[in-house]
Amino acid sequence: MNTETLSDISDEIKSHYPTMLQSWGIIGISILFKVLFTPVFFLSDYTGKEQTFLVYQVLALGSTFAYAHLRRKKTTGISTYDFNPASTKIMVLLAVSTICLLVSIRVPLVSVLPRPEWLPDLSKTFTVNNPYSIVSLVLVAPVLEELIFRGIILDGLLHKYSPVKSIVFSSMLFGLIHIHPIQLVSAFLIGLFAGWVYYRTSKISLCIFIHFINNFLITLVVLFYTDDTSTDTLAATGYRHYLIYLFILMAVGGVAIYLLNKEFNTQGRNTASFSSPSRMSNLNEQTK
């Protein structure tokens, strides 16, 4: 017999953070911190641009996470995140899925959506042999951004809204903070994948791993190739050959995601921890 009452579930759902409106508030706070810490770049003449960007990333993203984390803790009493690793099989499937998704999306986007002139060319901003740029893009960004967008925003939304609405909305916000048109689209799609993985596992560690693979590959491309190089390479390869190449990548990625889904089903989902609207609907039916 189900002893859970409508009042119990209603109170539980109200206690979670954030709502969609509050999620927009987190984005606003993020923009505010980015503006407030902009003067840090004046130090680049003394410390170097890579070191300065690393400090800026830590301050801006770290402050945003601290704000959202404290709000979440105050509202829900929750202050922990699941950093437990997954099996080697899952990690390999995640890596393959992410690589296929990234390559099949980014190369055609580069040829269709060239970098706007008002945006800086990162290949001229960072040097490949500088460890600070690698730490900024491959370590700091994946950890802090995933804690914000999956660990806090998506986690809170999943307790209030349907999984599809929660994942799409949080991914849209994740895409919007990446100003570059190519990054916006690819970040949205990677966000959908990471969001689905988080919904199935509740493990922030897996989302960080996906983001790490994504940023690591993008960093290599940005540091070794320009946008023009990518476009020329696509033209030289031939669009027919590229379509075959794209189909193979999508097929491999699709198989990897299928196997990943089977693995999640085998190991059991953690989705029961989320208070979905379906629970409210079912309970309403029981109380009629």
Regions found by a protein language model. Give the residues of each.
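Membrane-interface helix/loop boundary segments of multi-pass membrane proteins
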Residues: 144-169, 196-203
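C-terminal membrane module of polytopic membrane proteins
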Residues: 212-288
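Juxtamembrane helix-loop-helix connectors linking adjacent transmembrane helices
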Residues: 76-143, 155, 159, 232, ...
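Functionally important transmembrane alpha-helices
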Residues: 33-40, 183-239
